[in-house]
From Swiss-Prot:
The keyword Cell membrane does not apply. It comes from the Eukaryota. Residues 1-22 form the signal peptide. This is Raniseptin-5. Residues 23-49 form a propeptide.
Length: 80
């Protein structure tokens, strides 16, 4: 009977330990998923910022090009 009790306690102990390990892995997995989601959100925000900067640079390039074209035209065809 004592052997049966020890075996039962051993089985229960091992079951609790394995359950504890599974719960810990599950928590780690959830934390990793949260971090990945946060990284994706940051990536989306960074992409928006990059697009905004590229649009600003594009518009600045257009303005500089128009000014340069006007300067060249005035240089080639000066008004008197």
């Amino acid at each position: 009977m004592a052997f049966l009790k020890k075996s039962l306690f051993l089985v229960l102990f091992l079951g609790i330990v394995s359950l504890s390990i599974c719960e810990e892995e599950k928590r780690e997995g959830e934390e990793e998923e949260k971090q990945e989601e946060e990284n994706e959100e940051l990536s989306e925000e960074e992409l928006r910022e990059k697009r905004a900067w590229l649009d600003k640079l594009k518009n600045l390039g257009k303005v500089v090009g128009k000014v340069a074209l006007g300067v060249v035209q005035n240089y080639l065809n000066p008004r008197q």
